[in-house]
Amino acid sequence: QSLDGCIAREDGESHWISGQEDLDHTHRLRALCDAVLVGAGTVIKDDCRLTVRRCEGQNPLRVVLDPNASVPTESALFSDATAPTLWITGSTGADPGQPLGENVDILKLPCEGGRFALDRVLSALADRGVRRLFVEGGGFTITRFLKAGLMDRLHIAMAPIFMGSGRSSTQEALGQSLADCPRPQVSVYPMGGD
């Protein structure tokens, strides 16, 4: 993210705010987890593959939270068969209009107000053997996990850039007052220019 807390410009441009060393680190984190999870907005915006390509390691299960089944079926996550994908959609959402690859499973879970109960998501992932989950993005999804107190560790890459305005790394208030806001212990590690 930028020094002023943005993960994208207002027009959505985000490639690349941080440097190559941070991208390498992201791939290492993917290689260390059982599953990598993103929200539908990240897939729609970035058409990401969420695979391990910049280091050695196994590809994790790719998980997409998509209450409205809005991710296009031509997305890389569904057409790239190098890793398994779990597409979590709302229980009342539409089924995809075309068949998906053998690497894609669809799990329908109930939604309330367009949101999944994260404890149900985590339980479903645990049933599939997921013990180490990397919540990679985007801002809305990470904010939900933070608010629910479901993050053990948070990696934030701060790039030496000011954007002035743009999409914030968190999408909702994390407390009713400053006293309620999370104040985690912090460690700082330089990664190239970030």
Which stretches of residues belong to each language-model region?
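Enzymes that bind and transform nitrogen-containing heteroaromatic metabolites
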Residues: 1-194
